[in-house]
């Protein structure tokens, strides 16, 4: 199934179970989604340099659940639905294509560039994926930031003013850790 990322068949089943339990029954569903267990798993995964080959069933589920906790089920179901309308030529055929296609669909569904978030998890993203998402704002307040993963600095609106032969005033905006606010430097 093209909407199932490499190595995540069991994760997809668990994800569907979480959705059904939360949406239809009104309970959290499984003890493995307990906040303490999730925190321990993520700490272990990121301490091991977020190697995608170690992206196990429950760790992969955490990747999806964090997105669900930020935006709800809507963007996830929207992103998954896209796969069922793809022409055969557009169905991802390699692991790398599957990871990159998912990041494009979920980013467009949330309205945020989730490439840095998925890169933090170790997804093998291409430059084309990053470039395709430059029109979307980066999700700068994701819960990985600071606690589990240290992102590269996000700089935007880099400008130079008052240029002379010996000096230049440079200004830019950076995101502050865990805050969706831009500050001018």
Report each predicted region and the residues it spans:
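Zinc-dependent metallopeptidase catalytic helix centered on the HExxH motif
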Residues: 1-40
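Proteins with a high burden of low-complexity, intrinsically disordered sequence enriched in S/T/G/P/A and R
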Residues: 1-12, 75-77, 81, 166-185
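Flexible domain-boundary/linker segments
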Residues: 29-31, 81, 135
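Active-site-proximal alpha-helical
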Residues: 39-130
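Beta/coil-rich, acidic/histidine-enriched accessory regions frequently appended to metallopeptidases
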Residues: 95-185
């Amino acid at each position: 199934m093209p909407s199932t990322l490499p190595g995540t068949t069991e994760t997809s089943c668990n994800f569907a179970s979480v959705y059904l339990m939360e949406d239809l029954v009104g309970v959290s569903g499984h003890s493995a989604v307990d906040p303490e267990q999730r925190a321990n798993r993520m700490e272990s995964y990121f301490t091991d340099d977020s190697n995608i080959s170690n992206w196990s069933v429950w760790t992969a589920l955490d990747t999806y659940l964090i997105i669900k906790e930020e935006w709800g089920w809507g963007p996830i179901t929207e992103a998954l639905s896209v796969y069922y309308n793809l022409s055969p030529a557009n169905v991802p055929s390699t692991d790398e294509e599957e990871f990159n296609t998912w990041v494009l669909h979920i980013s467009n569904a949330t309205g945020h560039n989730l490439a840095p978030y998925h890169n933090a998890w170790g997804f093998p993203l291409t430059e084309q994926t990053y470039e395709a998402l430059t029109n979307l704002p980066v999700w700068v307040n994701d819960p990985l930031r600071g606690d589990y993963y240290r992102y590269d600095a996000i700089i935007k609106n880099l400008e130079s003013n008052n240029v002379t032969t010996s000096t230049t005033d440079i200004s830019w905006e950076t995101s502050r850790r865990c805050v969706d606010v831009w500050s001018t430097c």
